[in-house]
Swiss-Prot record:
Organism this protein belongs to: Aedes aegypti (Yellowfever mosquito)
Source organism, top-level taxon: Eukaryota
GO cellular component, one term: histone deacetylase complex
Pfam families named in the record: SAP30_Sin3_bdg, zf-SAP30
Zn finger (Atypical) location: 21-69
The protein's role, per its UniProt record: Required for the function of the class 1 Sin3-histone deacetylase complex (HDAC).
Protein name: Histone deacetylase complex subunit SAP30 homolog
Alphabetized GO MF terms: DNA binding; transcription coregulator activity; zinc ion binding
Cell compartments where the protein resides: Nucleus
């Protein structure tokens, strides 16, 4: 019920809770309960780019999606496109951990790009930027033994810059 533009709360409780997900999953209508996530143009673009077999049901009177599809879309956003082709090949990256650069802030990704002079096209979005940086990140050669030796030396000699900053700030107070 609506009183002079104010809600009594009754219609709010009948929102997505009694609605079914508005998506067609590979042509079949999803029967899960709709959550509070909506199928926006941005999400639709992600679904198209990642080639997920999801589309909105034109018969649905809302754009709310279930938690299952929300999670699936979010998961697809962070995965790299070429994962399937890498799984088919005989390459094994079992010893290399997968780093999810999408979790970093855009400014951090841009600083990395600027520092390593990684070239990208202008107007690139966060997902594309993190994917480009991930490709570059994997090409950086590292000498594990040398890095570990240096790390242990720095810890034992108390030469860590962060420790020095903490000590000077403690002495000043």
């Amino acid at each position: 019920m609506n009183n002079n533009g104010f809600s009594t709360g009754e219609e709010d409780s009948r929102g997505p809770a009694d609605q079914v997900c508005c998506l067609l999953d590979d042509g079949d209508r999803c029967r899960n309960q709709a959550g509070n996530a909506s199928y926006s143009k941005r999400i639709q673009k992600t679904v198209t780019q990642r080639r997920l077999k999801l589309s909105i049901d034109t018969a649905a009177r809302h754009i709310y999606i279930c938690d299952f599809h929300k999670g699936r879309i979010q998961c697809a956003r962070t995965k790299r496109r070429r994962r399937d082709s890498e799984d088919d090949s005989n390459e094994t990256d079992t010893d290399l951990p997968e780093v999810d650069l999408y979790q970093l802030q855009v400014n951090t990704l841009r600083r990395y790009k600027r520092f390593y002079k990684v070239s990208t096209r202008p107007g690139i979005n966060k997902a594309q930027l993190s994917e480009t940086i991930m490709k570059h990140f994997k090409t950086i050669p590292i000498k594990e033994k040398e890095i570990l030796t240096y790390f242990i030396y720095m810890v034992k000699s108390n030469s860590n810059k962060l420790d020095q900053k903490n000590n000077t700030s403690n002495e000043a107070t």
